[in-house]
């Protein structure tokens, strides 16, 4: 008899799954605040790239990573999901 629900086991789910589970159950004000902080970071990053004339390079790199460096891209996205989930959990 297994007393643990495998769907609840954070060790078998992905960072993406964990984030969405946490974001659905956490205080929505905190979730929204952390999401907005992440978008602010993205906006500043884009501004820096624009100021340096690198916005086209960003699109090229994104296409290249999707095509040839998929694991690296997934790892980077997973780190962002982990960061968001951690920021939410530490405030609840």
For each predicted feature, which ranges?
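Charged low-complexity stretches with an acidic bias
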Residues: 57-92
């Amino acid at each position: 008899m297994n007393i643990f629900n495998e769907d609840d086991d954070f060790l078998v789910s992905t960072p993406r799954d964990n984030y969405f589970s946490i974001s659905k159950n956490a205080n929505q004000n905190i979730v929204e605040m952390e999401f907005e902080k992440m978008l602010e970071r993205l906006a500043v990053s884009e501004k820096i790239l624009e100021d340096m004339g690198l916005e086209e390079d960003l699109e090229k790199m994104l296409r290249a990573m999707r095509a040839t460096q998929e694991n690296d891209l997934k790892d980077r996205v997973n780190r962002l999901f982990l960061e968001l989930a951690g920021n939410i959990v530490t405030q609840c």
